[in-house]
Amino acid sequence: MRNNQPVTQRERTFPAQQRLISTTDAKGVITYCNDAFVEISGFTREELVRAPHNLVRHPDVPPAVFAHMWSTLKQGLPWMGIVKNRCKTGDHYWVNAYVTPVFDGNQVIGYESVRIKPTAEQIRRAEALYQRINQGKSAVPQRDKWLPVLQDWLPFILVSQLSFLIGVWFDSHWGFALAAALSVPLG
């Protein structure tokens, strides 16, 4: 994976209404870029056109982000994500990117990317995600992996607790029968 250097800790921004637009061929080589993209990147149009789009790749962005992007695009599907890009000077800028394949019939012949300014919250979440991935951790915190499991088992847990309480209150045989009857509507 390309490692563009140098990098600084200076962030550049662009107006919220501005759109950074570029197109590439099927291999990711830039074929078009608008003035806004040229301006924020710090590269000249001549340096950008015919260069691989990863020219603006910032080394803080984990390779897994781009692997996911390319996997999605090669399936003919659009991809969205918050990406930290590197300027020619080493400064950086954040984008909320929407990348879509360009088709000729059934064949992908290139890609178009429209990027807008992300919110501060989107940037904060992306930085946290990038940091987790770059530290070799799972993209999803371990504690969040239990939520779907808990949601699947919640009706059973509630019924079993209800059964126990009813069993204590009535007598174990009646409590079980009543809890079984109550569990039918819960699934």
Predicted regions mapped to residue ranges:
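PAS-family sensory modules
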Residues: 1-25, 116-154
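Conserved hydrophobic beta-strand signature of PAS-family and PAS-like sensory domains
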Residues: 30-31
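PAS/PAS-like sensory domain cap-loop motif
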Residues: 38-48
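N-terminal sensory regulatory modules of PAS/LOV and PAS-like folds
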Residues: 45, 52-54, 61
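PAS/Per-ARNT-Sim sensory domains
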Residues: 49, 59-75
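PAS-family sensory domains
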Residues: 84-89, 103
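Short loop/turn elements at sensory-signaling interfaces that couple input to output
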Residues: 98-111, 116-125
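Alpha-helical transmembrane segments and their helix-membrane boundary motifs
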Residues: 140-187
